[in-house]
């Protein structure tokens, strides 16, 4: 999802990949007027409509959705990845570059090092270093998923950063 500076427009993109090859099967984008003001922790109400439109337009059978957002590692333990996963009734996970809640122990700088994100003693996600000596990304379950599988899949997806790059490029193309 990308917002157009100075305009009330949101651009959303969807990339469907074949697993495990990560071959691009479909790409789609949409631009819509923003109908909900930004409220921290309620991104689904701002970003959900264009994303739902994209999912409804695809003819592909989707087995899992990876959102650039949060699932359980959210102040309400129900971030965009959880919310849209439930609405679509498709397994989902959230992967973000920003930790919203909780904390984790010090991590090794080694690629694929990981530490649980704890909130009040409960594991709500996993901090995962996707590249050596870089800041970690944060993985959490959304809907009908488990953390072990979510982390394993994310490690496979971030080998070349391709999935996020494809989708971000598509969002920028939609803006043009």
Where are these regions (language model features)?
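Polyanion-binding surfaces on beta-sheet-dominated domains and ring/shell assemblies
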Residues: 45, 51, 57-58, 73, ...
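A charged, well-structured terminal subsegment
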Residues: 124-144
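Two-metal-ion RNase H-like nuclease active-site motif
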Residues: 1-4
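A glycine-rich, hydrophobic loop/mini-helix early in the fold
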Residues: 7-58
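A contiguous pocket-lining binding segment that forms or flanks enzyme active sites
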Residues: 77-123
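Catalytic-site beta-strand/loop segments enriched in glycine and acidic/polar residues
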Residues: 51-84, 88-90
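Single conserved hydrophobic/aromatic residue that forms the stacking wall/gate
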Residues: 168-176
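Flexible, glycine/charged-enriched surface loops at secondary-structure junctions
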Residues: 160-166
């Amino acid at each position: 999802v990308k917002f157009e500076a100075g305009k009330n427009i949101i651009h959303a993109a969807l990339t469907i990949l074949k697993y495990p090859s990560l071959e691009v099967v479909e790409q789609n984008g949409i631009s819509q007027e923003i109908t909900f003001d930004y409220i921290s922790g309620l991104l689904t109400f701002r970003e959900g409509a264009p994303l739902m439109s994209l999912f409804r337009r695809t003819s592909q059978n989707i087995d899992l959705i990876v959102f650039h957002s949060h699932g359980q590692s959210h102040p309400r333990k129900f971030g965009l990845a959880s919310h849209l996963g439930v609405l679509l009734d498709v397994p989902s996970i959230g992967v973000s570059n920003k930790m919203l809640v909780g904390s984790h122990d010090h991590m090794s700088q080694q690629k694929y090092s990981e530490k649980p994100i704890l909130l009040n003693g409960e594991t709500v996600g996993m901090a995962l270093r996707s590249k050596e000596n870089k800041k970690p990304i944060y993985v959490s379950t959304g809907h009908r998923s488990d953390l072990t599988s979510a982390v394993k899949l994310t490690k496979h997806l971030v080998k070349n950063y391709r999935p996020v790059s494809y989708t971000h490029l598509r969002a920028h193309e939609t803006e043009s």
